[in-house]
Regions:
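Conserved RNase H-like, two-metal-ion catalytic cores of nucleic-acid enzymes
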Residues: 4-5, 9, 15-54, 70-71, ...
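Extended two-metal-dependent nuclease catalytic cores across DNA- and RNA-processing enzymes
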Residues: 24-25, 74-253
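Conserved "right-hand" nucleotidyltransferase catalytic core of DNA-directed polymerases
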Residues: 235-347, 426-619, 638, 648, ...
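Function-dense linear segments that define catalytic or interfacial modules
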Residues: 336-343, 367, 395-418, 422-426, ...
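Active-site palm subdomain of RNA-directed nucleic acid polymerases
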Residues: 456-468, 472, 793, 797-818, ...
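Conserved catalytic core of nucleic-acid polymerases
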Residues: 481, 587, 594, 599-602, ...
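C-terminal polymerase-core module
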Residues: 500-507, 511-563, 731-779, 783, ...
């Protein structure tokens, strides 16, 4: 049976846009979504070998669903400018590939896909749907397979579902998936569902009763009781409407002929080569082996004399080796050790442990932190000479991912094939393939480490690498292993307290509205505010009234209901994101949150915190700050919080060599009051609280390249006044003005900027023909040396503090870094010593011509320690 591959293009491009770090051509054209999309497409072509390919796109126009329900997708934010710019380019690339584009006004891509799948089934063609959206699982059958694209550990992976696989995974059939969505709704599409029915309940009901029609015909006889029974009865109308909205239309009026979608491959495709070359997607050009690849490096055969065998660690000699580990969960299943062109596979656990703990052998590894965290002290990896993933990040921090395979392809044009996980037959030697793959990675790692090491030296980044980023790997592993203790009981109480407040606010809103309605529905809220209460609409959308935060802020003084709605939204988000969300990630064994800290994500050098993101714990409201009360020290310990004071302004004073700013910091004066005094021409002692606040906004705004429009908004003044304030500021701070002018010129000339430790950030946006993108590039040029240097300083401090805590044999441990602060869980007998270490190491982390100041506090909870 012939095979057709159809792409849910918007879905895959959207996932790629958010999953791939910002990439752009030299002219500033964003390319990250296209890059990710093409990598997924090429993987699918290789895996599925389709006879036909077509791509479905949404059309920017209302669909029949918008006519059925005005609130459909009303909450969805507009497509980001960077993604919107790539949509037509993606179509150009697909057309050049010979891929047929399918789109129809009034219908969504899913409807086109459903229709094509039906036509394929009728024509005895096997249909494969590639998507990032589970909505398409309703189309799965014995002839139609749904390929869900997912990203795991930096790799694009695919999961294939037919009807049996859907049933096995979710315990409902593909068509029953529609009924599940009818009950639980879908916030991303603003499909309402039944209020109060979540995914778990919806799945359970449909698994038992198979359809909402059956459920509602027998609503009193299927075991529902109490509030759930009432919720279901109240939500009947919404359930049936939601089912209509969630059902893919498989009779979309499109012209489709599979024979017009024949896929012939990419050979000698000059048009495709030219488009990819213009977008500077050179790695895609390499993968496709397109003719005329004059701007791509010649392939180097790094495996020319390659040899490997499975044995023991003594078969590799030398005092420096490469080590690649293969994990099964948190345990090492095998390893490969390389030296030159030779590699040895290790399968014995004792051999691997002995090698890793041998301090006399220097080890070149890749993403060591992950290994340290997984091993969690069972094996102590000693003498880590290099982490090539970190080095590659320093050389080019804008990549979306760092893997040995990708780097080998980029640097040498070498393809390292990753063996399939599945075993096709008993005769397949999967273990041998895996061993050879690991061995090749070990050999490639050695060559990569040498080549990337040369670039580190060329860039003058030795100190940044050897003294900051490489030792930080171990420190971050310690942070992840240590974790932060959470008072789960107190967190539950706080969640309950918020729930009570939300219920009270709900009742107040209903009373003021004169009726009950879905507060979370912008459409219903709009009707209440602008029709029933007759408030003047601030903005209208195609589907109704705008009710976003900006609109509500403007209506705050027009009716008391608005304040209650704003507070309701704030508390609802606080509860769902930070109370319920945090409780879900508390380790049940340690009762701690073990956030993941990553070095290779941000282009500024700042660390990334995920699972959960502890850098986003709210601080602007008292209720938000209360979340920090749930993060506590264990018994017999206290939290010591050390926070750099105005570190970015101090870095600015140093880099700009601004005398006024330098003198203020050296004299320990209030920099914001000094700025107000200088700009307004008044004595320092006469500066008011409001004047200081305005000066503070300017001081920090200047660091981020703030303009008069943004400043005017922040200070609630006219644009003319804001412009005058900025001009007066730059007249007084000559060094800052000169820095701003010189760094922009230098960045335009070189195409990049550097921190004090030579951390590099390339800024292709400066060459964009788009004025707004160029302006963004200038702001990046201004801020990166300051923010990046501040990031380098806090990292240096982390390394020094962690080393001293360990080397001095203290029980106290570094457990968190958030922006400019470090938190140590200190034993009660070591508090003074910990404070001394934090003060000494943080204040001496980097020598500036102004002092680095650290504010310190202690407490049982994170809240108390702030």
């Amino acid at each position: 049976m012939k095979k057709l591959l159809i792409l849910d293009s918007n879905s895959i491009l959207n996932r790629a846009f958010y999953g791939v770090r910002y990439l752009s051509a030299k002219d500033g054209t964003p390319t990250n979504a296209i890059y990710g999309f093409l990598n997924i497409l090429l993987k699918l072509i290789k895996e599925q070998e389709p006879d036909y390919i077509c791509a479905a796109f949404d059309v920017k126009a209302p669909t029949f669903r918008h006519k059925q329900y005005e609130g459909y997708k009303a909450q969805r934010k507009p497509m980001p400018e960077g993604l919107a710019a790539q949509m037509p380019l993606a179509k150009d690339v697909l057309r050049a590939m010979g891929v047929t584009i399918l789109e129809k006004e009034g219908y969504e891509a899913d409807d086109i896909i459903g229709t094509v799948a039906r036509l394929c089934e009728e024509s005895e063609i096997s249909c494969f749907i590639a998507t990032g959206d589970k909505d398409d699982l309703q189309l799965a059958s014995d002839k139609t397979k749904v390929i869900l694209t997912v990203t795991k550990s930096g790799y694009n992976e695919t999961i294939i579902y037919d009807d049996k696989a859907v049933k096995e995974k979710y315990h409902v059939t593909p068509t029953e998936f529609i009924d599940v969505k009818a009950l639980m709704g879908d916030p991303s599409d603003n499909i309402p569902g039944v209020k109060g029915v979540g995914e778990k309940t919806a799945m359970s009901l449909i698994e038992k009763h198979h359809s909402i029609e059956y459920i509602y015909e027998n609503i009193d006889d299927i075991g529902l009781k109490g509030t759930m029974l009432q919720k279901m009865k109240d939500g009947r109308e919404m359930a049936f409407m939601s089912k209509e909205l969630a059902t893919i239309n498989r009779n979309t009026p499109i012209e489709f002929n599979a024979e017009k979608c024949v896929f012939d491959g990419f050979e000698n495709n000059g048009e495709l080569y030219e488009i990819l070359k213009r977008l500077e997607l050179n790695s895609i050009i390499k993968k496709l082996d397109l003719s005329g690849v004059d701007n791509v490096k010649e392939n180097e055969d790094i495996f020319k004399d390659f040899s490997y065998q499975v044995g023991d660690k003594n078969m590799i000699s030398g005092d420096k080796v490469t080590v690649v580990l293969d994990f099964d969960g948190d345990n090492i299943s095998s390893a490969a050790v390389g030296a030159g062109n030779n590699a040895v596979g290790l399968n014995e656990q004792d051999d691997i442990k002995e090698l890793l703990e041998d301090d006399s052998i220097a080890k070149v590894m890749f993403d060591v932190k992950e290994a340290i965290v997984k091993l969690n002290c069972r094996i102590d990896i000693k003498n880590i000479a290099d982490d090539t993933a970190i080095a590659a990040y320093l050389v080019d921090p804008a990549k979306n991912e760092y893997t040995i395979e990708k780097l080998a392809s980029e640097y040498f044009g070498t393809v390292i094939e990753k063996p399939e996980v599945k075993q096709l037959s008993l005769l397949d030697d999967v273990e041998t393939d895996r061993s050879e793959y690991l061995a090749k990675c070990a050999v490639a790692l050695g060559v990569l480490n040498e080549r990337i090491g040369d670039k580190i030296k060329e860039n003058g980044q030795e100190k940044l690498y050897q003294e900051v980023e490489l030792p930080l790997v171990t420190v971050l592993a310690h942070l992840e292993i240590n974790g932060f203790l959470v008072d789960d009981h107190q967190l539950k109480e706080f969640a309950d307290k918020l729930g009570e407040k939300i219920d009270a606010l709900t009742n107040e809103i209903y009373m003021l509205a004169g009726e009950e309605f879905n507060i979370n529905s912008p459409k219903q809220l709009g009707v209440i505010l602008f029709e029933k209460l007759e408030l003047k609409p601030v903005k209208k959308t195609k589907t109704g009234y705008a009710t976003n935060a900006d609109v509500l802020e403007k209506l705050r003084d027009k009716h008391p209901i608005v304040n209650f709605i704003m507070e309701y939204r704030q508390l609802a988000k606080l509860k769902s994101t930070y109370c319920d969300g945090l409780r879900a990630v508390v380790n049940p064994n340690t009762h701690r949150i073990h956030s993941v800290f990553t070095q290779t994500v941000t282009v500024t050098g700042r660390l990334s915190s995920t699972e959960p993101n502890l850098q986003n714990i709210p601080t602007r409201t008292e209720l938000g700050r209360e979340i920090r009360k749930m993060f506590v020290a264990k018994e017999g310990y206290v939290l010591v919080d050390a926070d750099y004071s105005q570190i970015e302004l101090r870095v600015l004073a140093h880099i700009a060599n601004d005398e006024t700013m330098i003198n203020a910091f050296r004299n320990n004066e209030d920099i914001h009051a000094v700025t107000a005094s200088q700009v307004l021409g008044i004595p320092l002692e006469d500066v008011t609280k409001e004047q200081r606040s305005s000066a503070k906004a300017v001081n920090f705004g200047i660091v981020y390249g703030i303009g008069e429009f943004s400043l005017a908004q922040d200070l609630h003044i006219s644009v003319k006044e804001a412009k005058a304030y900025i001009e007066s500021y730059l007249e007084k701070y000559h060094g800052v003005r000169n820095y701003m002018e010189s760094i922009k010129e230098q960045a335009k000339k070189d195409g990049y900027v550097k921190t004090m430790l030579n951390r590099i950030r390339y800024i292709p946006e400066l060459k964009s023909p788009n004025y707004n993108i160029r302006q963004f590039g200038e702001r990046v040029a201004l801020n990166t040396p300051i923010q990046g240097t501040a990031a380098d300083i806090i990292k240096l401090a982390m390394v020094r503090v962690d080393n001293r805590l360990i080397n001095e044999g203290l029980k106290s441990k570094l457990i968190l870094q958030v922006h400019d602060e470090l938190i140590v869980e200190a034993h009660k007998d070591e508090v003074d010593k910990v404070k001394q270490i934090l003060s000494e190491e943080m204040q001496s982390a980097m020598e500036l011509n102004v002092p680095l100041k650290v504010d310190m506090s202690t407490g049982h909870s994170w809240y108390d320690a702030k």
